[in-house]
Amino acid sequence: MASGDDSPIFEDDESPPYSLEKMTDLVAVWEVALSDGVHKIEFEHGTTSGKRVVYVDGKEVIRKEWMFKLVGKETFCVGAAKTKATINIDAVSGFAYEYTLEINGKSLKKYMENRSKTTNTWVLHLDSEDFRVVLEKDTLDVWCNGKKMETAGEFVDDGTETHFNIGNHDCYIKAVSSGKRKEGIIHSLIVDNREIPEIVE
């Protein structure tokens, strides 16, 4: 089938709502963990057609056709907080290209390293459903499955507790001093009086 052919790919009624041409120029896929969830970024780069397409969580956010300059960058937003993301397209040799993702002006690796210092993440299973809880240490915002939670803070003898609910479940994040300068404050998620282990993203 020629690439410009508009004829259907399948003869029966079971054909998918997209053609096989969709995503044929897919060159890079990244997963980015933000407070509101893990986002999938896909990038198509047609080196012969000059096409550039960016998808975030399966939705097209940028489409450019007939770009004569094959190197450059595409900038867009990801997630509820509209986090700035940039895909850099660089020539490495001949017709080979390198694709790198920056989040808030940092390489993805550097961003994730910084993020692990500024957030805590827990994953738990309640009432037959999976939940991802994220604490942003700088703002003390709590996110659960992509939604910013309403919280109530309270001082206790050995630190603070930030209370919120997941469904009918009482939850709080307890913050206590580690007593060690390098470790700083230790945050623990307690759900129904049970501590949930933290995960590293």
Swiss-Prot record:
Segments crossing the lipid bilayer: none
GO-annotated cellular components: cytoplasm
Compartment(s) of residence: Cytoplasm
Keyword Cytoplasm: yes
Keywords from the named record: Apoptosis, Cytoplasm
Function, as annotated: Plays a role as an inducible effector molecule that mediates Fas resistance produced by surface Ig engagement in B cells.
Protein family (similarity comment): Belongs to the FAIM1 family.
Name of the protein described by the UniProt record: Fas apoptotic inhibitory molecule 1
Annotated organism of origin: Bos taurus (Bovine)
